Amino acid sequence: MKIAIFSDTYLPQINGVVTSTQTFSRELEKLGHKVLICGPKMKGATRLTHKVWRFRSFTFPFQKEYRFINPFSRILRRFKKLGVDIIHVQTPFSMGYLGQYLGWKYKIPVVHTYHTHWEEYLHYFPLFPKNIEVDIYP
């Protein structure tokens, strides 16, 4: 199978999502699958290769390590020709939206992995009441 992994974070960043993306990629390739990683272009990142596609991006206003991508990249014209069988989205943000959109547009199945326990971050957002109950089950 040809699998495209979409993530808002990738090397040279180091975090749990990057580690997960690398692990998925390595293990899927061991099983004989071809993997394409789609992530943001950033300082120190490798250039476009057959395995990693980089999208122009800009920093998130109050979190400099996170980036938004420009979804109007010319490389998207080549996406359909790749013959991707499944899209694995690793983020609910800009690259995740792009992966979901491409899945819808080209009728490619999409799976999504959440890496953040959102209920543990609600207290950082003043719009949510302090006594809100969140029922999230693994």
Question: What are these model-derived regions, one by one?
Answer:
Residues 1-54, 79:
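N-terminal subdomain of nucleotide-sugar transferases
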Residues 3, 86, 103-121:
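Active-site proximal beta-strand in glycosyltransferases
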Residues 38, 89-90, 113:
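Structural motif
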Residues 49, 99-102, 125:
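Short amphipathic alpha-helical segments
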Residues 60-63, 119-124:
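A short acidic, helix-capping loop that chelates divalent metal ions and anchors anionic groups
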Residues 61-89, 95-101, 105:
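An amphipathic, basic-hydrophobic alpha-helix
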Residues 105, 132-138:
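Membrane-proximal helix-turn-helix segments that form the acceptor-binding/catalytic region
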Residues 125-131:
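Short glycine-enriched, charge-decorated loop/helix-capping segments at active-site entrances
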